[in-house]
């Protein structure tokens, strides 16, 4: 063998078998940034059709977690695939930089504003802290191979962005959507601030469930509503009974609410302490059972509408409250009579407005009753529940009391229960200028992926209250408005004033609002107006980035966003705040498509939790396995549902990666010595099997591009794996090894094969590039021929071709041959197991086939043996089937396997009768002699 070694085409490449990604990726990253890869992409795509994926900003606090990695990698895959499809697809990453979590971190370091530091100094410390957090997260994202404007990201605290956020507020106000109101809002007593809908999460909580008597203030008038017969009016006090799980709100009670069409029953409670109570007829038995009342009977009935404006005594204060009517009253639970505190509930507030009820709020921002709150002053509301229940007992107003577990709103930061609390706030009104209706209409024009996203956001927009955009915080964009001291009206020149403030903020940041003297902007009117000192909800900051970033950044060339891509929780967060603000400002949705991914869970479907110990940190994965493994994990998952990750799942991704890498390595190693400029074989002159392989690549490419276009990333990975492992690895690459290694160096048989390998790897490297970016770059640099510096600046390979129309050895033919090969392989395996043969090249095959199949197989002529990887293979009619022939799982095909008696060729290891018959080459076969000393063997089919 050694004397012929130099005549073989041995594979050789600088592309190593092991990726060693954790060590080599940082070196590649260094080169990408040194050679300005992102800038090169931008230059290459300048003037092409635009694609804008607008980045939803993560919060600038803490290390990135696996959910961040999933989100950013998905975005990067889509951007890179769009770039390869010929789009100009800039990516400007962003960060949300204002708000409470940053304030809390800074408070730990410097104390609260106004204590050890001034508010201005505190804001500066917040800015510094957020900037440091952005830098840390930025490096983590870059390590994942994500390309973007990392030197010029957007941060909601950039002066220009802060100024544009203020301009957005002005635009919303001028379009008639801004509203000031004293309304109940979600309030966290730990934050000391209002919360947005998206900052509220629901968890189970145990509360006191109480049924409370409100005695009638006019017994005769009330009883007359029930049309009782004389002498059957019953006896004892008359009360209407409410049910509540928030006893602490009873000091703010200003009404009891019924439903107009419900039937209410007057019940006589019998026994030593007779009384009469009113509840909804439907719920009467439940109420009696709950209260343990066994002896009672009905006295009469009345509709809710008949009881409207009846007066009842507050259970522990010296005033009366009316019975009012509301649609929100149900018979799902309770008594059918709803305790109404307009200062502590949105439905209560809405119905209270109709009846002009007082919006009482006896609770301070810290959750403690105000000093003038009778009976309960100075108590925290949740601790006061017991005190309220005790007071009700003392007053004889408590009918029943038990502990009740129910879903209750909690603060997403503190994980503590929140309250509804009426405070003066600024709102984006959903209805005063038709914003809700316009938003619902615009949703229909957006493509929601998955489709259920549409009904989800529609339901949320239909049911959502006014958007409370004001916060009583220090670190935030100011609500830069002037209101009249007496009328509370906005200044008539609000839009002009906002532009003046925005220009100041562009120059000096948000501190300019607190520093500027009102007289500088208002002149003589300054005495009549006061500055609003509230800050904007951070969801407003991020929600208006369609204006403050997309419309403002020159990289987008005035194009609006094509795609928003975030986790499915953003239907109630960023998707919604963006939609509402965009409709309020421009009358159109801010996006054309909205794509969501699920949350990351562990291998058992559990949430990531430090206490469980199942947290997978992106940094740990990149340090151990490399970013391409993490990227392949993302691309292998149906991200529309929950996305599972664990060491075992990542190991599977690493195994899949190795298979793809080994396929690429085979291609590169066998392109050794190939120069595309001089060695390409024209398609019509290529060996039939090589043409077929290029055709399979074309079919795969069409499916892969379609899947990328539809954001169906896991379908890309599945098709890529199928192509590498099945179509190439299990068949084509297996068959061509013999020809590639043993054919005449530089001869037609070898160059035809190399031409196919070259075309296929040109396509393959591009399919891989959006997903396994580091590995694709590595492959690109090992490929033969002149090429651009980076795979990412090009487009999909357009040099592939399919088999010609009407070609005899078409796709159907090769599919049939693969089936035959599969059937034969089973028998060869059995022969090996029985020690009839050592390896397949020690076998001689006779295939007994029916006429149709024999005609097909015979098209390969003497090259059938190369497809079957045996030293000899003959085809005979089925009628001549020998006794030794074995059935296969193909109808009409029997195969006889026997050990060859021919000598083994030292060079190609085939056993052929002509080994030793050629003078000067006694150890090799005639085919090898031709490949070493002659013109080279001729291959037409395989």
From Swiss-Prot:
Its main location: cytoplasm. Its cofactor is Zn(2+). PROSITE patterns: AA_TRNA_LIGASE_I. A motif ('KMSKS' region) lies at residues 607-611. GO terms for cellular component: cytosol. L-isoleucyl-5'-AMP binds at residue 566. Binds 1 zinc ion per subunit. It is an enzyme of class 6 (ligase). GO terms for molecular function: aminoacyl-tRNA deacylase activity; ATP binding; isoleucine-tRNA ligase activity; tRNA binding; zinc ion binding. It catalyses: tRNA(Ile) + L-isoleucine + ATP = L-isoleucyl-tRNA(Ile) + AMP + diphosphate. GO terms for biological process: isoleucyl-tRNA aminoacylation. A motif ('HIGH' region) lies at residues 58-68. The keyword GTP-binding does not apply. Keywords: Aminoacyl-tRNA synthetase, ATP-binding, Cytoplasm, Ligase, Metal-binding, Nucleotide-binding, Protein biosynthesis, Zinc. Catalyzes the attachment of isoleucine to tRNA(Ile). As IleRS can inadvertently accommodate and process structurally similar amino acids such as valine, to avoid such errors it has two additional distinct tRNA(Ile)-dependent editing activities. One activity is designated as 'pretransfer' editing and involves the hydrolysis of activated Val-AMP. The other activity is designated 'posttransfer' editing and involves deacylation of mischarged Val-tRNA(Ile). Monomer. Belongs to the class-I aminoacyl-tRNA synthetase family. IleS type 1 subfamily. PANTHER family: ISOLEUCINE--TRNA LIGASE, MITOCHONDRIAL, SOLEUCYL-TRNA SYNTHETASE. IleRS has two distinct active sites: one for aminoacylation and one for editing. The misactivated valine is translocated from the active site to the editing site, which sterically excludes the correctly activated isoleucine. The single editing site contains two valyl binding pockets, one specific for each substrate (Val-AMP or Val-tRNA(Ile)). This is Isoleucine--tRNA ligase. It comes from Vibrio parahaemolyticus serotype O3:K6 (strain RIMD 2210633). The lineage of its organism: Bacteria, Pseudomonadati, Pseudomonadota, Gammaproteobacteria, Vibrionales.
